Regions:
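Extracellular/periplasmic solute-recognition and catalytic clefts
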Residues: 91, 184, 190-202, 372-383, ...
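N-terminal lobe/hinge region of extracytoplasmic solute-binding protein
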Residues: 86-151
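Aromatic- and charge-enriched surface segment that lines or borders ligand/interaction sites
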Residues: 142-196, 223, 229-231, 239, ...
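Append "and occasionally in soluble cytosolic enzymes with long acidic Gly/Pro-rich linkers
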Residues: 380, 467-596, 736-737
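C-terminal motif of bacterial Sec signal peptides marking the signal peptidase cleavage site
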Residues: 18-21
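Detector for C-terminal structural segments
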Residues: 378, 478-515, 583, 587-597, ...
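Aromatic-rich, solvent-exposed beta-strand/loop patch
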Residues: 231-251, 271-408, 434-452, 564
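Short, well-ordered beta-strand elements
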Residues: 83-92, 155-158, 177, 228-229, ...
């Protein structure tokens, strides 16, 4: 069972959900971050959620996206399709098949085929193609029973179907639904594994259990082999997306922890009756700990190949990371010392097995497909003969699936040639045009939907010059955002003004009303100048003489070359904004072409630097007190739950923009605490939140685009595509025409 949140660490930068080997619960993911990433966004993580990150950089290429050698690559491509194998092309794979580490979007795709997360596994609830929650009739005998307790908490009772099986034929029982929560909420789990899953923190008794001050987890209870209940904390309620707090999925206890069992009441783990811990168990545990220590040391050495100079900013960061590494290694070494309690040893052994073995080789699952192998940039899956079907009663029939890494530049060519069967979520205008031409020629099928998110410029709002709202607003007035729609999205998109996706149900119901209340930031240097006059940066270099737009106009000759009439504050600090973007990103290029020139005209020095994704994430996730960069080109994708409190409240665990604003605290708290039955009240608060966001501008929305998915003509039944619904969701209704 999983109802978890996650924390950030040096080892993990992205927002992710927790493991539920046959479907996840997403309390960890209170929102975007849950961020869903796309192939044109960064899909290597450490969202760090989705997520992270919930945020990743939007990347792009030229309009044609063809490079030298691509034509030869098309000719040399090895086709692995056959009558029984569906091949899905992706741009990369990471190889993490459980949550808690990286959250590569294509690893997630594989997990969803296997039911490790998503709608195909036997979770207690699922999300349909329209983004609506339902209890899962594939899993449960009847609708869950919810009791509101006198202390404000809520207890949910579940009764499972008795015919559910793991891929190895073992029955799925209540023990499997409680095991994951007990394991990942254990006091040793995070220190031992480095996972960013922190367990079921929305349940009663979590804090005491996580701290190790009690042996029992009060918020869960086993009723019989096929029934159990959970109790949500009073301070978590009300919560508008209540199913997010109550959704539960199973983990294969018999495979991950074969020598453990649940106590009769299901509130703790114990050594299985009749089993004696062996010397081999102790040896295996010690070896697992040693392997973990070695990986921690290797990761540190990779991050810091050279020791920074004393007194440098890099040295401070290095010393902090070194201490964290040494502390973690010490804790791991200590775990091997002395006489270890048998139960403790087996719990720790299971934690390491889940995160070191099962993570890379999920041999037992309960979704429509089971894991065969991951090598040569391909994940190979085979039909799970023990799968009983999804909530609609549909059951997959295609014998094999291959998820194959390909060059995105030639993806559409491979699709036309039949070398791959599916290419999903394309957002580049040039490739979309190519796909449309192929569809019109009868070569492929094509579907499209509005992106559930947007590309943006994200700010640090508590340091540097971007800590002033007027500076952020001025930057918005220095952009021609329509150019991003035209040149990046190829016209397949629109400019947006708030924290929403065009496909969200809230926007569909209230979007027209909301837009009348929001500022539509358009290129307007006069407005930008007025706003900057309200900031401390209203002087010339001497800190006394008022800065003059007339002088700026006299000195500006059409570009920043030779221009040196910038704004300063009274202490002689220049108005400078430094932005970091990806070095292979067309978005970075578009921003570089606009902002430095436009900003100079109003006295702002705007610099755009590019580099690797990892460098961008480091600057964004771990900013210095005096940061090198306070602006970043990123992308946001919405998942479940939609909970801006996580990202913009001063108490939010994923408040990467460093917002500390009373109004933000109020509107985000009010939104999440809306009663689930008060839909109109929620929409009112959603509008109020977006009005705050549009004014405060922790991010500047640049564009929201359309996604296009292509598939070969032999693929049948792929007739539902939405932001919530992809091939890995529709697979149970799909066939291959022979």
């Amino acid at each position: 069972m999983k109802i978890n949140r996650v924390f950030s660490s040096v080892m993990a930068l992205a927002l992710t959900t927790t493991l539920a080997a046959c479907g996840n619960s997403n309390d960890t993911n209170k929102d975007d971050n849950a961020s869903n990433k796309t192939k044109e966004e960064t899909s290597t993580t450490d969202e760090k959620s989705s997520t992270d990150i919930n945020k990743d950089e939007d990347k792009g290429g030229s309009d044609t996206d063809k490079n030298e050698g691509d034509e030869e690559a098309i000719k040399d491509f090895e086709n692995v399709t056959d009558d029984d194998t569906l091949v899905i092309g992706v741009d990369n794979l990471g190889g993490d098949f459980i949550q808690g580490y990286t959250n590569n979007t294509n690893d997630v795709k594989a997990r969803r085929f296997m039911g490790i997360e998503g709608n195909n596994g036997f979770t207690t609830h699922y999300v349909d193609e329209a983004g609506q929650w339902h209890w899962n009739p594939a899993t449960l005998e009847k609708e869950p029973k919810i009791v509101n307790n006198e202390d404000g908490s809520a207890t949910v009772e579940y009764k499972l179907k008795k015919d559910l099986k793991w891929s190895d034929g073992e029955p799925i029982t209540a023990d499997d639904y409680l095991f994951g929560t007990l394991l990942e909420s254990d006091s040793n789990f995070n220190t031992l594994t480095g996972s960013i899953n922190i367990g079921a923190d929305s349940l009663v008794g979590y804090n005491e259990f996580k701290k190790g001050t009690t042996d029992e987890f009060d918020g869960i209870e086993k009723l019989d082999d096929y029934s159990f209940k959970i109790t949500i904390k009073a301070d978590e309620l009300p919560y508008f997306e209540l199913p997010q707090l109550t959704v539960v999925g199973p983990s294969p206890m018999h495979y991950i922890a074969p020598n453990l069992s649940l106590a009769d009441n299901g509130k703790s783990l114990k050594v299985k009756d009749g089993y004696k811990v062996t010397d081999e168990d102790k040896k295996d545990f010690a070896e697992s700990v040693d392997n973990k220590i070695e990986k921690i040391k290797e990761e540190f050495d990779e991050s810091y190949p050279e020791e920074p100079k004393e007194g440098s900013d890099e040295r401070k960061e290095y010393d902090e990371a070194l201490k964290e590494k040494d502390d973690q290694v010490k804790d791991l070494e200590d775990s091997k010392q002395g006489d270890i309690d048998p139960t403790r040893l087996l719990i720790d052994k299971a934690s390491l097995f889940e995160t070191e073995d099962y993570r890379l080789n999920p041999a037992v699952v309960c979704g429509p497909y089971k894991f065969d192998e991951y090598k040569n940039n391909m994940v190979k899956l085979s039909l799970n003969e023990n799968y009983t079907g999804n909530f609609n009663g549909d059951k997959a029939t295609i014998p094999h699936i291959i998820i194959q890494v390909i060059n995105p530049n030639i993806a559409v060519d491979l699709l036309e040639n039949g070398d791959i069967d599916i290419w999903e979520d394309e957002m580049k205008g040039g490739r979309i045009d190519q796909m449309k031409a192929a569809e019109q020629a009868g070569k492929i099928g094509l579907g499209q939907f509005e992106r559930n998110g947007f590309g943006n410029i994200t700010f640090l709002t508590d340091r540097g010059s971007t800590k002033y709202k007027e500076v952020r607003q001025a930057i918005a007035y220095l952009l021609d955002r329509n150019e991003f729609v035209t040149n990046y999205a190829g016209g397949y998109g629109v400019v947006t003004n708030g924290y929403y996706g065009l496909s969200q149900w809230m926007y569909k119901e209230r979007g027209a009303d909301l837009e009348t209340k929001l500022t539509n930031y358009t290129l307007n240097t006069d407005k930008a100048n007025e706003l900057l006059d309200k900031t401390p940066y209203k002087y010339e270099k001497d800190g006394k003489t008022p800065w003059s737009i007339d002088k700026a106009n006299e000195q500006f000759k059409g570009d920043v070359e030779g221009f040196d009439y910038y704004r300063y504050d009274e202490n002689g600090n220049k108005l400078v904004v430094n932005q970091f973007g990806g070095d292979d990103s067309e978005i970075t290029t578009l921003i570089s072409n606009q902002l430095p020139v436009n900003a100079a005209q109003v006295g702002m020095e705007y610099n755009v630097q590019s580099g690797s994704l990892q460098t961008l994430l480091d600057y964004y996730n771990f900013p210095k007190d005096d940061p090198d960069y306070t602006a970043f080109n990123m992308g946001t994708g919405f998942a479940h739950p939609f909970d801006p409190w996580l990202h913009f409240s001063s108490e939010g665990p994923f408040n990467k923009t460093k917002v500390n604003d009373k109004k933000a605290d109020e509107v985000t708290e009010a939104l999440r605490r809306t009663d689930p039955d008060d839909k109109d009240g929620y929409l009112d608060k959603w509008e109020e939140f977006n009005e705050w966001y549009n004014d405060y501008l922790p991010e500047i929305p640049l564009y929201a685009n359309q996604y296009h998915t292509g598939y070969t003509n032999r693929v049948k039944g792929f007739d539902i595509m939405t932001p919530e619904w992809h091939a890995n969701d529709q697979i149970n209704a799909m066939t291959l025409e022979k």
